[in-house]
Amino acid sequence: MSEQKAFNLKIDEQNIAWLGIDVPNEKMNTLQAAFADEMKAIFAQLKDSSGLKGLIVHSLKPDNFVAGADVRMLEACKTAPEAEALARQGQELFQQLSDLPYPVVAAIHGPCLGGGLELALACDFRVCSDDDATRLGLPEVQLGLLPGSGGTQRLPRLIGLLPSLDLILTGKQLRAKKAKKLGVVDACVPQTILLDVAKQFVEKGKKRAKQKVTTKEKLLSGSGLGRKFVFEQAAKKTHEKTRGNYPATVAILQVIQHGLEKGMKQGLELEAKRFGELVMSNESKALRSIFFATTEMKKETGSEAKPSKVGMVGVLGGGLMGAGISHVSVAKAKVPVRIKDVSNDGVLNALKYNYKLFDKQRKRRILSKAQLQSKMLQLSGGTDFTSFNRTDVVIEAVFEDLSLKQQMVADIEANAKPETIFATNTSSLPIHKIAEKAQRPENIVGLHYFSPVEKMPLVEVIPHESTSEETIATVVALAKKQGKTPIVVKDQAGFYVNRILAPYMNESAHILLANEPIDKIDTALLDFGFPVGPITLLDEVGVDIGAKIMPILVAELGARFKGPDVFDVLLNDGRKGRKSGKGFYTYKGKKKEVDKSVYKLLKLTPESKLSDNDIALRCVLPMLNEAVRCLDDGIIRSPRDGDIGAIFGIGFPPFLGGPFRYMDQFGLKELVEKMNQFAEKYGDRFAPCDGLLTRAGEGRRFYDN
């Protein structure tokens, strides 16, 4: 344990104890097993101190309370009982805090998450700042875990069963006012008076009285029948969402129910036991690997060079992508944006799109009316290049047409500063071709966003051979400020995400042409863990977009990207997907149904012959094969980048950890065997690539751990 202490105890003149948390050499406070002895000693001292009026637990960090338990300590656990012991230790410490004979108040400013909230729940009262940085939640489920230090038992007893299930099963984070409304905190006040208000709670001199239970809560969780109904409904809804792929949700329901029926002591025992089991599960290991990867990536700059300052962004094109890019630039990166479109309608649509998103935040009380107006004032636009001479980065989001994009480069070189970076949001065109006629090719880079931009977390940064290191560093820094996770990929057709997606989509078309029903194919991949099935995805992206991308991949990467002739048949029948109201499905508002006339159009007689598992593997194996080729061709820099790209870019099942983690878990020898079986049965497109064969033959893995 470090010599510096994480917990600082002071007793003031009024006999109020102040426990300040300040984890040494860390920006954020996190709870670590190494602090256990220190905490035990402090709680023993507090228990034995006579005449104390109360205790206030607060943070000595300027911007966070406790961001959770340090997830790294779980990696040292080799068995479920070891992980269970960690949970029991946390439970015992928080129980000691709860058992102190005087009022204990948590004064919360900034993130109060996971173990941090469990610490606060063990206090009698909670007071938080109304600052936007204050967030409260139990996000353990997102790591494939459950709250292991009493959270599953204390929260339902504090705020009731239904709101607790919602918070613990989703891992959602509450803003301060919502936390007050739900009863998670007792007061929500300006940060300047936070500690004074905490003191007032101590001065009342009372421990927390038992919660008053509402009639609704009595009916729902107080009676065996009501409780049974709530848990049955919660299990049903959760299974619909997770399709049985996340064991943590099942454990959460079981542990909360057990605690309400058998009492808190037994509830805590089961909480610790299930926590230990979940720590050792493949799902949690995969989800934790994503957490560690994204944490690492936040520190990376993509280049050795220093990024240039970005004071203003220009956006070319007011369509869906341009509107989304302008939104994240203003809302997240907090830089003013100038939009240019060929028509005023295009600019107007982009502004309306932004207003709609900001207004949603106003309705949810995230933004005030004045803040909304202030955000909208950061956006302007027109049909000419006015103000583009002040832009530092221009992001182009026009149609996928090479000569049009080259013209955009020429226009920006003529109308912006010599050092202005031109970032193209192409999804398929090679960056070196877009930069071919540029006067300053070092300023040109690919910046591939995913739709809808304001929701999708990934961006691919694609330098071509002449892109400067400073340009790379600048767009990586900008993407991070926009709230994105950037991965730097090599300039080759399809880049990374679309390149691994193409064989997956092609195989779904092969399966369809073998008479498997459309909804059966989609369901098989949903059950595998994808957020949408491949046929639905094609409709969402647009059949016309797929038809444009595939020939580019075939031309540059070879015949293995040639899919069945489905696109042209659909497009000739006016089926572009959701945007045209019909594709493989028909769309009426939010409802979609399989358009059975597609079968006739494609001369098919739908009949289910394949198992769900075979359908899923047939789609996924070509994707895995292509991911390995991308790694060996230098398209991605590491298996980690490949995993994050696939999860954040196309929704590869997070509980599998990404294509490379999944291959390690599957076993490379077994994977090669399965691919060879499929190659024999369905064709050479399943033949394992050289990189897979070599690694399998040498007994190597993609990851060491």
Curated annotation (Swiss-Prot):
Its main location: cytoplasm. It comes from the Bacteria. Pathway: Lipid metabolism; fatty acid beta-oxidation. SUPFAM superfamilies: 6-phosphogluconate dehydrogenase C-terminal domain-like, ClpP/crotonase, NAD(P)-binding Rossmann-fold domains. It catalyses: a (3S)-3-hydroxyacyl-CoA = a (2E)-enoyl-CoA + H2O; a 4-saturated-(3S)-3-hydroxyacyl-CoA = a (3E)-enoyl-CoA + H2O; a (3S)-3-hydroxyacyl-CoA + NAD(+) = a 3-oxoacyl-CoA + NADH + H(+); (3S)-3-hydroxybutanoyl-CoA = (3R)-3-hydroxybutanoyl-CoA. Gene3D superfamilies: 1.10.1040.50, 2-enoyl-CoA Hydratase, Chain A, domain 1, NAD(P)-binding Rossmann-like Domain. Disulfide bonds: none annotated. GO terms for biological process: fatty acid beta-oxidation. Residues 308-705 are annotated as: 3-hydroxyacyl-CoA dehydrogenase. Residues 1-190 are annotated as: Enoyl-CoA hydratase. InterPro entries: 3-OHacyl-CoA_DH_CS, 3-OHacyl-CoA_DH_NAD-bd, 3HC_DH_C, 6-PGluconate_DH-like_C_sf, ClpP/crotonase-like_dom_sf, Enoyl-CoA_hyd/isom_CS, Enoyl-CoA_hydra/iso, FA_oxidation_alpha_subunit. Keywords: Cytoplasm, Fatty acid metabolism, Isomerase, Lipid degradation, Lipid metabolism, Lyase, Multifunctional enzyme, NAD, Oxidoreductase. It holds the Pfam family 3HCDH_N. PANTHER family: TRIFUNCTIONAL ENZYME SUBUNIT ALPHA (PTHR43612), TRIFUNCTIONAL ENZYME SUBUNIT ALPHA, MITOCHONDRIAL (PTHR43612:SF3). In the N-terminal section; belongs to the enoyl-CoA hydratase/isomerase family. This is Fatty acid oxidation complex subunit alpha.
